[in-house]
UniProtKB/Swiss-Prot annotation:
One of its GO terms (cellular component) is virion component. It is found in: Virion. Together with the penton and the other minor capsid proteins (M1249L, p17), forms a complicated network immediately below the outer capsid shell, stabilizing the whole capsid. Plays an essential role in the formation of infectious virus particles. Especially required for the formation of the capsid vertices. During virion assembly, associates with the membrane and probably mediates the docking of the penton complex to the inner membrane, where it recruits the capsomers to form the penton core. Residues 144-167 have a biased composition (Polar residues). Induction: Expressed in the late phase of the viral replicative cycle. Its main location: virion. Belongs to the asfivirus p49 structural protein family. This is Minor capsid protein p49. It comes from African swine fever virus (isolate Warthog/Namibia/Wart80/1980) (ASFV).
Length: 438
Protein backbone atom coordinates (compact mmCIF):
# COMPACT_ATOMS: atom_id res chain seq x y z
CA UNK A 1 0.00 0.00 0.00
CA UNK A 2 2.70 2.43 0.98
CA UNK A 3 4.84 1.44 -1.95
CA UNK A 4 1.99 1.99 -4.42
CA UNK A 5 1.30 5.44 -3.05
CA UNK A 6 4.91 6.52 -3.22
CA UNK A 7 5.41 5.03 -6.68
CA UNK A 8 2.44 6.89 -8.14
CA UNK A 9 3.47 10.15 -6.54
CA UNK A 10 7.11 9.98 -7.49
CA UNK A 11 7.13 7.95 -10.68
CA UNK A 12 9.24 10.53 -12.47
CA UNK A 13 11.93 10.31 -9.83
CA UNK A 14 12.14 6.53 -10.12
CA UNK A 15 13.21 6.83 -13.74
CA UNK A 16 16.10 9.12 -12.88
CA UNK A 17 18.17 7.48 -10.14
CA UNK A 18 20.64 9.92 -8.65
CA UNK A 19 24.32 9.49 -9.24
CA UNK A 20 24.86 9.15 -5.51
CA UNK A 21 22.67 6.05 -5.25
CA UNK A 22 24.16 4.32 -8.26
CA UNK A 23 27.73 4.99 -7.22
CA UNK A 24 27.62 3.96 -3.58
CA UNK A 25 28.42 0.29 -2.90
CA UNK A 26 25.65 -1.79 -1.43
CA UNK A 27 27.58 -2.84 1.67
CA UNK A 28 27.81 0.78 2.74
CA UNK A 29 24.08 1.36 2.37
CA UNK A 30 22.79 1.01 5.90
CA UNK A 31 19.31 2.00 4.79
CA UNK A 32 19.05 -1.10 2.61
CA UNK A 33 19.09 -3.19 5.75
CA UNK A 34 16.30 -1.03 7.10
CA UNK A 35 14.28 -1.65 3.95
CA UNK A 36 14.93 -5.37 4.00
CA UNK A 37 14.14 -5.50 7.67
CA UNK A 38 10.74 -3.94 7.20
CA UNK A 39 9.71 -5.63 3.98
CA UNK A 40 11.28 -9.06 4.30
CA UNK A 41 10.17 -9.93 7.80
CA UNK A 42 13.68 -10.08 9.17
CA UNK A 43 13.88 -7.56 11.97
CA UNK A 44 17.65 -7.89 12.14
CA UNK A 45 18.02 -6.83 8.54
CA UNK A 46 18.49 -9.10 5.54
CA UNK A 47 21.63 -9.01 3.46
CA UNK A 48 21.02 -6.69 0.49
CA UNK A 49 20.91 -8.33 -2.90
CA UNK A 50 22.42 -6.09 -5.51
CA UNK A 51 20.73 -6.15 -8.90
CA UNK A 52 22.99 -4.82 -11.63
CA UNK A 53 20.11 -4.07 -13.99
CA UNK A 54 17.57 -2.43 -11.74
CA UNK A 55 20.09 -0.82 -9.37
CA UNK A 56 17.97 -1.83 -6.42
CA UNK A 57 18.24 -4.42 -3.68
CA UNK A 58 16.40 -7.46 -4.98
CA UNK A 59 14.85 -8.56 -1.71
CA UNK A 60 13.43 -5.13 -1.04
CA UNK A 61 12.20 -4.36 -4.54
CA UNK A 62 8.57 -4.32 -3.47
CA UNK A 63 9.27 -2.01 -0.59
CA UNK A 64 10.00 1.67 -0.62
CA UNK A 65 13.23 2.50 -2.38
CA UNK A 66 15.41 5.38 -1.38
CA UNK A 67 14.64 7.11 -4.66
CA UNK A 68 10.96 7.05 -3.70
CA UNK A 69 11.74 9.31 -0.79
CA UNK A 70 13.76 11.97 -2.54
CA UNK A 71 11.02 14.55 -2.28
CA UNK A 72 9.56 13.61 1.09
CA UNK A 73 10.27 15.29 4.37
CA UNK A 74 9.80 13.67 7.72
CA UNK A 75 7.98 15.35 10.54
CA UNK A 76 9.93 16.44 13.55
CA UNK A 77 7.98 14.18 15.85
CA UNK A 78 9.77 14.09 19.19
CA UNK A 79 8.04 10.87 20.18
CA UNK A 80 9.60 9.00 17.25
CA UNK A 81 13.02 7.92 18.38
CA UNK A 82 13.46 5.21 15.81
CA UNK A 83 11.63 5.82 12.56
CA UNK A 84 12.44 3.70 9.54
CA UNK A 85 11.71 4.36 5.91
CA UNK A 86 8.66 2.12 5.89
CA UNK A 87 6.39 3.99 8.30
CA UNK A 88 4.08 5.65 5.86
CA UNK A 89 2.42 7.86 8.44
CA UNK A 90 5.72 9.67 8.73
CA UNK A 91 5.98 10.39 5.01
CA UNK A 92 4.86 13.77 3.82
CA UNK A 93 5.04 15.54 0.49
CA UNK A 94 7.61 18.27 0.85
CA UNK A 95 7.62 21.32 -1.37
CA UNK A 96 9.97 20.61 -4.22
CA UNK A 97 13.23 22.50 -4.19
CA UNK A 98 14.30 24.17 -7.45
CA UNK A 99 17.21 22.31 -8.92
CA UNK A 100 19.23 25.47 -9.24
CA UNK A 101 19.11 25.76 -5.45
CA UNK A 102 20.75 22.41 -4.78
CA UNK A 103 24.02 20.71 -5.48
CA UNK A 104 22.22 18.62 -8.05
CA UNK A 105 23.94 15.28 -7.82
CA UNK A 106 23.90 14.92 -4.07
CA UNK A 107 20.97 13.00 -2.66
CA UNK A 108 19.10 14.63 0.16
CA UNK A 109 17.54 11.74 2.02
CA UNK A 110 16.62 11.33 5.65
CA UNK A 111 18.58 8.65 7.48
CA UNK A 112 16.75 6.00 9.44
CA UNK A 113 17.87 6.45 13.00
CA UNK A 114 18.74 3.51 15.19
CA UNK A 115 19.32 3.25 18.90
CA UNK A 116 23.09 3.15 18.39
CA UNK A 117 24.82 6.46 17.99
CA UNK A 118 27.76 4.83 16.23
CA UNK A 119 25.41 3.82 13.43
CA UNK A 120 24.12 7.36 13.26
CA UNK A 121 27.61 8.59 12.61
CA UNK A 122 28.78 5.81 10.32
CA UNK A 123 25.85 5.82 7.92
CA UNK A 124 25.99 9.59 7.45
CA UNK A 125 29.71 9.64 6.81
CA UNK A 126 31.16 10.04 3.35
CA UNK A 127 33.64 7.22 2.86
CA UNK A 128 37.16 8.04 1.81
CA UNK A 129 37.66 5.21 -0.67
CA UNK A 130 37.98 6.58 -4.16
CA UNK A 131 35.35 4.38 -5.82
CA UNK A 132 32.58 5.28 -3.40
CA UNK A 133 32.31 8.90 -4.49
CA UNK A 134 30.15 10.37 -7.24
CA UNK A 135 32.10 11.54 -10.22
CA UNK A 136 31.75 15.20 -9.43
CA UNK A 137 34.58 16.08 -11.77
CA UNK A 138 32.28 15.09 -14.63
CA UNK A 139 29.62 17.61 -13.72
CA UNK A 140 29.21 20.79 -15.68
CA UNK A 141 30.45 24.01 -14.15
CA UNK A 142 26.89 25.26 -13.88
CA UNK A 143 25.95 22.20 -11.84
CA UNK A 144 28.95 22.54 -9.57
CA UNK A 145 27.96 26.05 -8.68
CA UNK A 146 24.23 25.42 -8.17
CA UNK A 147 24.34 26.43 -4.55
CA UNK A 148 22.09 28.63 -2.48
CA UNK A 149 23.86 31.96 -2.49
CA UNK A 150 22.44 34.61 -0.15
CA UNK A 151 23.39 38.05 -1.37
CA UNK A 152 24.53 39.07 2.11
CA UNK A 153 27.29 36.45 2.18
CA UNK A 154 30.68 36.63 0.46
CA UNK A 155 31.02 34.91 -2.85
CA UNK A 156 31.38 31.16 -2.53
CA UNK A 157 33.13 30.92 -5.87
CA UNK A 158 36.09 32.85 -4.54
CA UNK A 159 37.20 31.52 -1.15
CA UNK A 160 39.57 34.47 -0.79
CA UNK A 161 36.57 36.69 -0.09
CA UNK A 162 35.63 34.58 2.91
CA UNK A 163 36.33 35.97 6.35
CA UNK A 164 38.34 32.83 7.13
CA UNK A 165 41.06 31.41 4.86
CA UNK A 166 39.75 28.17 3.39
CA UNK A 167 43.02 26.35 4.06
CA UNK A 168 43.14 27.15 7.75
CA UNK A 169 40.71 24.45 8.82
CA UNK A 170 41.25 21.92 6.06
CA UNK A 171 42.37 19.30 8.55
CA UNK A 172 39.29 19.78 10.71
CA UNK A 173 36.51 19.70 8.16
CA UNK A 174 36.58 16.30 6.50
CA UNK A 175 33.78 13.80 6.92
CA UNK A 176 35.12 10.61 8.41
CA UNK A 177 34.48 7.83 10.85
CA UNK A 178 36.91 6.26 13.24
CA UNK A 179 37.52 3.44 10.76
CA UNK A 180 38.63 5.97 8.16
CA UNK A 181 40.95 7.92 10.43
CA UNK A 182 44.21 6.23 9.34
CA UNK A 183 43.31 6.72 5.68
CA UNK A 184 42.94 10.49 5.84
CA UNK A 185 45.73 12.58 4.42
CA UNK A 186 45.43 15.51 6.77
CA UNK A 187 47.80 18.27 7.70
CA UNK A 188 48.65 17.79 11.34
CA UNK A 189 46.89 15.88 14.07
CA UNK A 190 43.17 16.00 14.74
CA UNK A 191 42.50 16.42 18.44
CA UNK A 192 39.25 16.21 20.33
CA UNK A 193 40.09 19.40 22.20
CA UNK A 194 40.13 21.49 19.04
CA UNK A 195 36.88 23.37 18.66
CA UNK A 196 36.49 25.24 15.43
CA UNK A 197 35.17 28.28 17.23
CA UNK A 198 38.20 28.44 19.50
CA UNK A 199 40.59 28.46 16.56
CA UNK A 200 39.28 31.71 15.13
CA UNK A 201 41.43 34.84 15.41
CA UNK A 202 40.13 38.34 15.96
CA UNK A 203 37.79 40.01 18.42
CA UNK A 204 34.55 39.01 16.74
CA UNK A 205 32.96 35.64 16.17
CA UNK A 206 33.44 34.58 12.58
CA UNK A 207 30.49 32.24 12.35
CA UNK A 208 31.48 28.84 13.65
CA UNK A 209 29.72 27.44 16.66
CA UNK A 210 31.99 25.10 18.64
CA UNK A 211 31.01 21.53 17.89
CA UNK A 212 30.03 20.88 21.50
CA UNK A 213 27.28 23.50 21.29
CA UNK A 214 26.15 22.47 17.83
CA UNK A 215 25.99 18.91 19.09
CA UNK A 216 23.68 20.00 21.90
CA UNK A 217 21.48 21.98 19.54
CA UNK A 218 21.16 19.31 16.90
CA UNK A 219 20.53 16.56 19.42
CA UNK A 220 17.32 18.38 20.27
CA UNK A 221 16.24 17.74 16.69
CA UNK A 222 17.62 14.25 16.40
CA UNK A 223 16.45 12.95 19.77
CA UNK A 224 19.51 10.75 20.08
CA UNK A 225 19.53 7.76 22.43
CA UNK A 226 19.42 8.41 26.15
CA UNK A 227 22.98 7.17 26.59
CA UNK A 228 24.11 10.24 24.70
CA UNK A 229 21.37 12.57 25.88
CA UNK A 230 22.20 12.11 29.52
CA UNK A 231 25.59 13.62 28.74
CA UNK A 232 23.90 16.55 27.03
CA UNK A 233 21.70 17.07 30.07
CA UNK A 234 24.90 17.39 32.06
CA UNK A 235 25.66 20.66 30.24
CA UNK A 236 28.30 19.42 27.89
CA UNK A 237 29.67 16.49 25.98
CA UNK A 238 32.78 14.95 27.57
CA UNK A 239 35.52 15.31 25.01
CA UNK A 240 36.70 11.76 25.63
CA UNK A 241 33.32 10.37 24.63
CA UNK A 242 33.91 8.01 21.68
CA UNK A 243 30.58 9.09 20.23
CA UNK A 244 31.86 12.62 19.72
CA UNK A 245 34.01 12.80 16.64
CA UNK A 246 36.16 15.88 16.00
CA UNK A 247 33.93 16.89 13.10
CA UNK A 248 30.66 16.02 14.75
CA UNK A 249 29.07 19.34 13.90
CA UNK A 250 29.64 18.85 10.18
CA UNK A 251 28.25 15.33 10.21
CA UNK A 252 25.28 16.31 12.34
CA UNK A 253 24.54 19.26 10.11
CA UNK A 254 24.43 16.89 7.16
CA UNK A 255 22.12 14.38 8.79
CA UNK A 256 19.99 17.04 10.47
CA UNK A 257 19.46 18.77 7.16
CA UNK A 258 17.98 15.63 5.70
CA UNK A 259 16.03 14.86 8.86
CA UNK A 260 14.37 18.26 9.10
CA UNK A 261 13.85 18.73 5.38
CA UNK A 262 15.99 21.87 5.40
CA UNK A 263 18.00 21.98 2.17
CA UNK A 264 21.64 21.57 2.95
CA UNK A 265 23.98 24.13 1.45
CA UNK A 266 25.98 21.94 -0.86
CA UNK A 267 29.73 21.76 -0.34
CA UNK A 268 32.08 23.51 -2.69
CA UNK A 269 33.12 21.40 -5.69
CA UNK A 270 36.36 19.54 -4.98
CA UNK A 271 39.67 20.48 -6.54
CA UNK A 272 41.17 17.11 -5.69
CA UNK A 273 38.36 14.72 -6.58
CA UNK A 274 40.72 12.05 -7.88
CA UNK A 275 41.79 11.42 -4.28
CA UNK A 276 38.22 11.22 -3.07
CA UNK A 277 38.25 14.65 -1.44
CA UNK A 278 34.55 14.99 -2.11
CA UNK A 279 33.81 17.63 0.49
CA UNK A 280 35.69 20.82 1.07
CA UNK A 281 35.29 22.92 4.14
CA UNK A 282 32.44 25.33 4.63
CA UNK A 283 33.27 28.99 4.93
CA UNK A 284 32.46 30.54 8.28
CA UNK A 285 29.43 32.45 7.03
CA UNK A 286 28.23 29.43 5.12
CA UNK A 287 28.52 27.28 8.19
CA UNK A 288 26.54 29.74 10.28
CA UNK A 289 23.84 29.98 7.64
CA UNK A 290 23.41 26.22 7.70
CA UNK A 291 23.21 26.10 11.47
CA UNK A 292 20.68 28.93 11.52
CA UNK A 293 18.53 27.16 8.93
CA UNK A 294 18.52 24.05 11.07
CA UNK A 295 17.75 26.02 14.20
CA UNK A 296 14.90 27.69 12.36
CA UNK A 297 13.47 24.31 11.45
CA UNK A 298 13.91 22.95 14.95
CA UNK A 299 12.28 25.97 16.55
CA UNK A 300 9.47 26.11 14.02
CA UNK A 301 8.50 22.46 14.30
CA UNK A 302 9.44 21.43 17.80
CA UNK A 303 8.21 22.11 21.27
CA UNK A 304 11.14 23.86 22.88
CA UNK A 305 11.66 24.18 26.60
CA UNK A 306 13.54 27.33 27.56
CA UNK A 307 15.47 25.67 30.36
CA UNK A 308 17.03 23.34 27.80
CA UNK A 309 17.94 26.27 25.59
CA UNK A 310 19.64 27.87 28.56
CA UNK A 311 21.79 24.77 28.89
CA UNK A 312 23.49 25.77 25.65
CA UNK A 313 25.83 28.47 26.93
CA UNK A 314 26.78 30.03 23.62
CA UNK A 315 23.35 30.08 22.01
CA UNK A 316 22.18 33.35 23.52
CA UNK A 317 25.23 35.20 22.27
CA UNK A 318 25.06 33.57 18.86
CA UNK A 319 21.46 34.53 18.13
CA UNK A 320 22.63 38.06 17.47
CA UNK A 321 25.04 36.84 14.81
CA UNK A 322 22.24 34.84 13.17
CA UNK A 323 20.17 37.99 12.70
CA UNK A 324 21.25 38.86 9.12
CA UNK A 325 20.65 35.28 8.02
CA UNK A 326 17.56 34.28 9.96
CA UNK A 327 15.50 37.21 11.26
CA UNK A 328 12.89 34.74 12.52
CA UNK A 329 15.15 33.32 15.20
CA UNK A 330 16.42 36.64 16.43
CA UNK A 331 12.97 38.23 16.56
CA UNK A 332 11.41 35.18 18.17
CA UNK A 333 13.99 35.04 20.90
CA UNK A 334 13.94 38.78 21.54
CA UNK A 335 10.18 38.71 22.05
CA UNK A 336 10.56 35.83 24.53
CA UNK A 337 8.82 33.53 22.11
CA UNK A 338 10.46 30.57 23.76
CA UNK A 339 9.43 31.37 27.33
CA UNK A 340 6.66 28.78 27.06
CA UNK A 341 6.52 25.52 25.18
CA UNK A 342 5.50 26.70 21.73
CA UNK A 343 4.39 24.44 18.93
CA UNK A 344 3.99 25.80 15.43
CA UNK A 345 1.62 23.94 13.17
CA UNK A 346 3.59 22.58 10.20
CA UNK A 347 2.51 23.12 6.63
CA UNK A 348 1.30 19.56 6.18
CA UNK A 349 -0.90 17.69 8.61
CA UNK A 350 0.15 14.29 9.80
CA UNK A 351 -1.58 11.44 11.56
CA UNK A 352 1.18 11.49 14.14
CA UNK A 353 0.67 13.84 17.06
CA UNK A 354 3.45 16.33 16.47
CA UNK A 355 2.47 18.48 19.47
CA UNK A 356 4.23 16.41 22.10
CA UNK A 357 7.04 18.18 23.91
CA UNK A 358 10.59 16.96 23.93
CA UNK A 359 11.50 14.63 26.80
CA UNK A 360 11.51 16.09 30.27
CA UNK A 361 14.98 15.64 31.66
CA UNK A 362 13.59 15.48 35.20
CA UNK A 363 11.73 12.27 34.36
CA UNK A 364 14.64 9.90 34.20
CA UNK A 365 15.28 6.41 35.40
CA UNK A 366 18.93 5.74 36.08
CA UNK A 367 19.94 8.50 33.72
CA UNK A 368 17.85 7.23 30.84
CA UNK A 369 15.31 9.37 29.04
CA UNK A 370 11.79 7.99 28.89
CA UNK A 371 11.66 6.56 25.42
CA UNK A 372 9.46 4.01 23.81
CA UNK A 373 11.60 0.99 23.06
CA UNK A 374 10.83 0.21 19.43
CA UNK A 375 13.06 -2.85 19.55
CA UNK A 376 10.27 -4.65 21.41
CA UNK A 377 7.80 -4.05 18.59
CA UNK A 378 7.28 -6.54 15.80
CA UNK A 379 6.64 -4.61 12.64
CA UNK A 380 4.40 -6.32 10.13
CA UNK A 381 3.28 -4.90 6.82
CA UNK A 382 0.65 -7.59 6.32
CA UNK A 383 -1.87 -6.31 8.83
CA UNK A 384 -0.98 -2.63 8.31
CA UNK A 385 0.08 -2.45 11.92
CA UNK A 386 1.33 0.95 13.03
CA UNK A 387 3.05 0.99 16.42
CA UNK A 388 1.37 3.05 19.09
CA UNK A 389 3.97 5.08 20.92
CA UNK A 390 2.80 4.80 24.49
CA UNK A 391 5.84 5.65 26.52
CA UNK A 392 7.63 8.61 27.87
CA UNK A 393 7.11 11.63 25.73
CA UNK A 394 3.82 13.25 26.62
CA UNK A 395 0.76 11.18 25.82
CA UNK A 396 1.40 10.76 22.13
CA UNK A 397 -0.98 8.42 20.37
CA UNK A 398 -1.00 7.26 16.79
CA UNK A 399 -4.02 6.01 14.94
CA UNK A 400 -3.85 2.27 14.41
CA UNK A 401 -5.52 2.51 11.02
CA UNK A 402 -4.29 4.21 7.90
CA UNK A 403 -6.31 5.20 4.82
CA UNK A 404 -5.37 3.41 1.64
CA UNK A 405 -5.72 6.56 -0.44
CA UNK A 406 -3.49 8.62 1.77
CA UNK A 407 -3.55 12.34 1.23
CA UNK A 408 -1.66 14.51 3.68
CA UNK A 409 -4.14 17.37 3.30
CA UNK A 410 -7.08 15.13 4.19
CA UNK A 411 -5.68 13.72 7.41
CA UNK A 412 -7.99 14.59 10.30
CA UNK A 413 -6.67 16.65 13.15
CA UNK A 414 -5.63 14.85 16.29
CA UNK A 415 -7.31 15.65 19.55
CA UNK A 416 -4.32 17.71 20.59
CA UNK A 417 -4.61 19.78 17.44
CA UNK A 418 -8.32 20.32 17.89
CA UNK A 419 -7.90 21.41 21.49
CA UNK A 420 -4.86 23.54 20.63
CA UNK A 421 -3.28 22.21 23.80
CA UNK A 422 -1.22 19.31 24.98
CA UNK A 423 -2.51 16.52 27.15
CA UNK A 424 -1.04 15.90 30.56
CA UNK A 425 0.90 18.36 32.65
CA UNK A 426 2.67 19.96 29.72
CA UNK A 427 0.98 23.18 28.71
CA UNK A 428 1.52 24.63 25.29
CA UNK A 429 -0.09 26.78 22.69
CA UNK A 430 -0.63 25.67 19.12
CA UNK A 431 -0.20 28.40 16.54
CA UNK A 432 -1.88 27.66 13.26
CA UNK A 433 0.00 30.23 11.25
CA UNK A 434 2.89 32.57 11.65
CA UNK A 435 3.87 35.65 9.75
CA UNK A 436 7.18 35.50 7.89
CA UNK A 437 7.98 38.89 9.36
CA UNK A 438 8.26 37.50 12.88
Amino acid sequence: MYHDYASKLLADYRSDPPLWESDLPRHNRYSDNILNSRYCGNKNGAAPVYNEYTNSPGKAEKGLQLSDLRNFSFMLNPQHKNIGYGDAQDLEPYSSIPKNKLFNHFKNYRPAFSTHTENLIKRNVVRTEKKTFPQVSGLKDTQKNCLTQPSSLPSLKNPKNSSVPSTRFSEHTKFFSYEDLPKLRTKGTIKHEQHLGDQMPGQYYNGYIPHQDVYNILCLAHKLPASVEKEIAGRGIPLGNPHVKPNIEQELIKSTSTYTGVPMLGPLPPKDSQHGREYQEFSANRHMLQVSNILHSVFANHSIKPQILEDIPVLNAQLASIKPVSPFLNKAYQTHYMENIVTLVPRFKSIANYSSPIPNYSKRNNGQAEYFDTSKQTISRHNNYIPKYTGGIGDSRLDSTFPKDFNASSVPLTSAEKDHSLRGDNSACCISSISPSL
